[in-house]
Amino acid sequence: WRTGSDQYGDPVPNSMYRYLWSNGPKECLEFADYSFDEHFGNPIPSFPPREVLYDYILGRVKKGNLKDKIRFNNNVTNVTYNGNNFEITSLDKKNNKFSKDVFDYVVVATGHFSIPFIPEYPGMKSFPGRILHSHDFRDAEEFRGKNVIVLGSSYSAEDVALQCHKYGAKSVTIGYRHNPMGFKWPNGVKEVFHLDRLEGSKAIFKDGHEQEADAVILATGYLHHFPFLSEDLKLKTGNRLYPPKLYKGVVWQNNHKLLYLGMQDQFHTFNMFDCQAWFARDVVMGKIKIPNNSEIEKDINKWVSMEEKLENPDQMIDFQTEYTKELHDLSDYPKIDFELIRKNFKEWEHHKVENIMTYRNKSF
């Protein structure tokens, strides 16, 4: 349960915590070519804990015999493009040895939930309690008997707040900036508008609410962070369903040999990543031809324009389902029942609205 730096001095990328369970139904994220039933041999609940999901992912890795094809404990430190190919510098961390390689294509699949965004609030430096980002949250039992402030209004804020409540926090106050999550919270959990400042051990909110605090947990999101890429290759975006400058959400508009995977905010996860990977594979192999810049711009603008009009979770689910469906149809990825996934996602969202404490008890 390491936080901070790993054994090599690099930031720990892991944002998981001890009692983490899937917050979305497994039926919506299953690999099309490797089912949960195939892996476990028996049906399992729709919302498995992290250890079960990890075991499932490892099973798919073993089935594909992938480990022998990966150089582990290597840190890519620099990527540049010389007009023909990519020059990559990497560090073998185990042997502390640098090497340089040349590649025709680069795929960036580093994720974007590892480098925390940490806002500043007046009074943070003099706050006598504990302040941490949800990235470093590991065990809710640490907050038993404490007054906890959680800042944020997305999945991390939701789950961290409920974890602290379940494991005995004295109170949990969730501060949101724009819109509240609006669930029917249990007694001891409440949402208030936007932290203004900390005064001693007291949190002062912009709606006038005041709350004694022992700990402040910043569930304030993450940064797309690519320190190894030269500036002309970096995707610069916030967390959104369709990042700009990516054709089909994958191909870098300014250099078609640079491919990004998994850079979107996500309802679909494993199946979307797979559809992106199949699409990227076919681009590299020349099976999919990239159109001219005018067509690329038109396609990107179409998706970005649709994204900007989304108003609620059901519309967002529809948007990402249609995006993943389009990618799927461009390759030979195995069949996916997108309409069933769409239906399950919407039921899941409605179950959360009905009872945020019990939605994981449902089966799909």
Residue ranges with predicted function:
Residues 92, 111-112, 136, 217, ...:
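Short glycine-/small-residue-rich Rossmann-like dinucleotide-binding loops
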Residues 1-59, 247-253, 290, 296-317, ...:
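Glycine-rich active-site loop/strand segments that organize a redox cofactor
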Residues 257-364:
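C-terminal, flexible cofactor-proximal segment of oxidoreductases
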Residues 94-105, 144, 206-215:
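Core beta-strand elements of the Rossmann-like FAD/NAD(P) dinucleotide-binding domain
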Residues 36-39, 49, 53, 99, ...:
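Glycine-rich dinucleotide-binding loop and its adjacent helix/turn
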Residues 72-87, 137, 177-202:
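A conserved short coil-to-beta-strand element within the FAD-binding core of flavoproteins
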Residues 42-110, 114:
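Feature captures the FAD/FMN-dependent oxidoreductase FAD-binding
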Residues 7, 16, 224-288:
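Glycine/threonine-rich phosphate-binding loop and adjacent beta-strand/alpha-helix elements that clamp
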